[in-house]
């Protein structure tokens, strides 16, 4: 998730085709009625006492109650409960499903409105040992309602002191309409980001030491919706709630 942001607009680039040698190795279709806790963990509360506001001055409290399943989708329900009190859900695959290299993709429909901040992202599995940002972070999808029609794709590393300098924001006029496919193609040399199979950003540094390239280890998935915060924006439109983040599926090819 973001702290300081240096950005550039990027037009959609080349399209993507799955290499023939890759196979589907894991999928989460969200076709059940409960979350599969063999693969998923809940992260609860407001981040306190260690990282209050989840490190970004976010307003929401995460609960197990703010999710449901509808028409084969996971639904994260973002609610306003009284004055300046918001609830949401955050889930991870830490310690259960972790992956190194391949194509990771999610099909999702984002919530909208000023103050909303949905994300599908990954953290290095060694985070408890080395901390953030040395563990590395891959933001496959981030959207903030204060900047409509734009998607953010980013990386965080020790070299950037956690700041989001390895990033692009891409204008997609219909991104708030219906479902879209967000993906990365991750190899030992590069990470390329895609929206609806169109390339939007590639990170391929010449230097690949542990501070620049912590992406040579397994990472785990995180799905959440934050409210407000340093990146989501402190000017929250209280009239937009409730909001829903719909996730159809996640698939990993290697």
Task: Give the ranges of each region predicted by the language model.
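Bacterial Sec-dependent N-terminal signal peptides
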Residues: 1-20
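GH16 jelly-roll
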Residues: 18-254
